Amino acid sequence: MAGVPAVRISIESACEKQVQEVGLDGSETYLQPLSMSQNLARLAQRIDFSQGSGSEEDEPGSAGRAWAEPSEAEDEEGLVKFQPSLWPWDSVRNNLRSALTEMCVLYDVLSIVKDKKFMTLDPVVQDPPPPKQDPQFLQLISKKKSLAGAAQILLKGAERLSKSVAENQENKRQRDFNSELLRLRQHWKLRKVGDKILGDLSYRSAGSLFLHHGTFEVIKNTDIDLDKKIPEDYCPLDVQIPSDLEGSAYIKVSIQKQAPDIGDLGTVNLFKRPMPKSKPGTPHWQTKLETAQNVLLCKEIFAQLSREAVQIKSQIPHIVVKNQIISQPFPGLQLSISLCHSSNDKKSQKSASEKQNPEGHLYVLEHNLHQLIRECHKQTLSSVVMPHPASAPFGHKRMRLAGPQAFDKNEISSLQTNEGLLEKIIKQAKHIFLRRRTARTIDSLASRIEDPQIQAHWSNINDVYESSVKVLITSQGYEQICKSIQLQLNIGVEQIRVVHRDGRVITLSHQEQELQDFLLSQMSQHQVHAVQQLAKVMGWHVLSFSNHVGLGPVESIGNASAITVASPNGDYAISVRNGPESGSKVMVQFPRSQCKDLPKGDVLQDNKWNHLRGPFKEVQWNKMEGRNFVYKMELLMAALTPC
């Protein structure tokens, strides 16, 4: 046996690790063994602290039963485990439970002593004997208490009523932001861009081609403290407009006689207009937006006028300096169109108050400029071809009628030439200036010359380029007899058309002197026509009549007119010559029998020659009695008329 070699035997230790998983290839995955701390924690988790602890005698039995039940279950499964005779953690559990109970009791006692909500540690004091009180004093105290209680109830009720009234008033004054935004949408175009609400002030939807965006922003008004009393004009909504549209603006149109120096062309005489007052019930944002939109429209008008002033070629070029356009419609006359924009800052208000000069501003032309720019917007919209039926021929109606109703070259050229905004306003300014000059000329003649009287009746139905006035020349007291001079003045852009009663038409230029000379000549002719009408009424005979006398001194203004009338029996004759400058000259011719200073000769022997009238004698017209020329002529004719 000694010579037999030793045989190596492989001894494999028993697997102390539990198998977690066996793979398909036969490999086993083991669980790591628990450490001492993990094993202690696993055992502590098996302790039931909620189970009440009994007597010491019962505890081993109960613990034995608790440990016996799992051991029996393990025996049934075929597993053999170590089972101690007594539970090792039983004393630990009991001590922990008793310590927890004592700590809870200590915490309750400390909290009660500290807070004194349920128990106070005060010594017991004997109650003092009740003092003896007077019954009347007790009755007074009870009445005071009852009155105080009633007063307190009344005060609480009054305070509650006042609070309810104040809350109702605040609820009426305080408007909701959404309802105010709905009102804003009813008047202005709004859109949502991100978290902002933007609106549109421009006239692009009406046909405007102005490049300004005209956008405003709707914001919430947070400048007021809701805890305090809300003012009457409080609005939860506010609008924020661009800085260049703040304040107020207007287009100033003025006509001046003398052109200023070239260095003063850029200065504009501003006068501060009062801000438009909001109507009762109108929110403040409505007035603010309307003012900003007016500023935008004024800027568009001035930009259009400036562009046309540079493009139009005229004999006298238009001048554009800063915010002012200078034009000369007539020689020695200047038309100024200015954009006046005053912001809300104090400097602009101070400068505007220092330069107040509203006298030269023509509000009519400013209003016409707004109308003209709106007409341009309307034409821009109308130029777009609107939807039409598919069966109808495509194109404009004028083009469809070009075959049967064709236009000639002049009509087509007239349709293609469109006047600009500046040309139209210059023509209107010319007409307004010519109309004012005509009215001033007529008024000056009426105030300067009392006999004959001149009356002007202006027509209410006028055009922007034409007006009419009816001029009557009469004598006081003889309006029914003297109706021969009736003139119709049609005032145009650059000339005045005068229509006489008999249909004759005379064209006058824009010069004031021409109109004045014409009216003076007509007033001179009126006196002669009045003598003619008076002679017919008095029974006198008209021997000669002429509106333009070729004899005598030459008048620098028009021509003199003359008339000769004879008495009913032919004994007397009156000759009247009236000129615009020389005035009236009246001469009377008497019979030869009444002329004592005639030389006697032997040539005329027959008495029939004595019936001829003698030479004319001039009447000292200044010494005649009467309020006017026609009345003096009536007295003279009455004196020379035989009974």
From Swiss-Prot:
Location of region: Disordered: 50-75
Record has Transcription regulation as a keyword: yes
Gene Ontology cellular-component annotations: core mediator complex; mediator complex; nucleus; transcription regulator complex
An example molecular function term from Gene Ontology annotations: nuclear thyroid hormone receptor binding
InterPro entries on file: Mediator_Med17
Biological processes, Gene Ontology terms: DNA-templated transcription; positive regulation of DNA-templated transcription; positive regulation of transcription by RNA polymerase II; positive regulation of transcription initiation by RNA polymerase II; regulation of transcription by RNA polymerase II
Subcellular location: Nucleus
Gene name of the record: MED17
Protein name (record): Mediator of RNA polymerase II transcription subunit 17
Family note: Belongs to the Mediator complex subunit 17 family.
Pfam families reported in the protein's UniProt record: Med17
Complexes and interactors: Component of the Mediator complex.
Chief localization: nucleus
Function, as annotated: Component of the Mediator complex, a coactivator involved in the regulated transcription of nearly all RNA polymerase II-dependent genes. Mediator functions as a bridge to convey information from gene-specific regulatory proteins to the basal RNA polymerase II transcription machinery. Mediator is recruited to promoters by direct interactions with regulatory proteins and serves as a scaffold for the assembly of a functional preinitiation complex with RNA polymerase II and the general transcription factors.
Keywords: Activator, Nucleus, Transcription, Transcription regulation
